[in-house]
Curated annotation (Swiss-Prot):
This is Urease accessory protein UreE. GO terms for molecular function: nickel cation binding; unfolded protein binding. One of its GO terms (cellular component) is cytoplasm. Keywords: Chaperone, Cytoplasm, Nickel, Nickel insertion. It is found in: Cytoplasm. Involved in urease metallocenter assembly. Binds nickel. Probably functions as a nickel donor during metallocenter assembly. The gene is ureE. Its main location: cytoplasm. Residues 197-230 are annotated as: Disordered. Pfam families: UreE_N (PF02814). InterPro entries: UreE (IPR012406), UreE_N (IPR004029), UreE_N_sf (IPR036118). One of its GO terms (biological process) is protein folding.
């Protein structure tokens, strides 16, 4: 196993590395959205190289990160992150609404997202929701609940990731495929451990039974993320 403790650079952001690896063979370390949020993991590259990732706690890997480079063989180990697409809901137009309308719309939107068990992060007057179903289904939910007046679009997860703090990225992309977790709407403040609104919706237990939580509450997590299971 090869221990990786530092990132050498990024082939997608650094012109120096772009030129250096222009004719190199890239051995990809392919990570899914959950793995990408971990600073420590063990995984093999596409060429079978066994890597042990051990980065500083607040460092997470980014798409295009260069982990190793062998000039003699002209081979570089580069990170490839596969993130889900994201629905982006623009809330800017609510600024022109009355306070009552704004509160009502935000509450109803949160309720709708909660009922679908969709994770979400609010930032820069936008709501980011990772896709867990077809875009047609998400489009239908928005229109069925009367949110067609709110502009929304679908973009690649990689376009959203640079705008997020590490904690927000973990919240949005870490385990977005889980169907039995609560929906979390993060604080718009770019803080590593901000509190968030937790919207409790219907939970399936895998045995055919389900139940509904009709209460909302907010609480902080301290310095860790966790799922709620019943």
């Amino acid at each position: 196993m090869i221990l990786i403790e530092h990132v050498l650079g990024n082939v997608k952001k650094d012109p120096v590395w772009q030129e250096k690896l222009k004719h190199a063979t890239l051995d990809l370390l392919v990570l899914d959205q959950r793995e990408a949020q971990k600073s420590r993991c063990r995984k093999s590259t596409t060429h079978g190289l066994d890597l042990g990732i051990s980065l500083d706690r607040n460092v997470v890997l980014a798409d295009g990160d260069v982990l190793a480079w062998d000039e003699e063989t002209n081979v570089a180990v580069v990170v490839q992150i596969n993130l889900r697409d994201v629905m982006v809901i623009d809330l800017s137009e609510l600024k022109s609404r009355s306070p009552d309308e704004l509160i009502k719309t935000c509450f109803e939107l949160g309720h709708a997202l909660g009922n679908q068990h969709w994770k979400a992060v609010t930032k820069n007057n936008e709501v980011y929701v990772p896709l867990t179903v077809a875009t047609t289904m998400m489009d239908s939910v928005m229109r069925t609940h009367g949110f067609q007046h709110l502009p929304f679009r679908f973009v690649k997860g990689g376009e959203i990731l640079p705008q997020l703090s590490n904690s927000e990225a973990r919240l949005l992309f870490g385990g977005a495929e889980d169907s039995d977790t609560h929906v979390h709407v993060a604080s718009p403040l770019d803080e590593p451990h901000g509190s968030g609104l937790h919207i409790h919706a219907i939970h399936s237990h895998g045995d055919g039974d389900s139940h509904n939580h009709d209460h909302d509450h907010s609480h902080s997590h301290g310095d860790h993320d966790h799922d709620h299971k019943h």
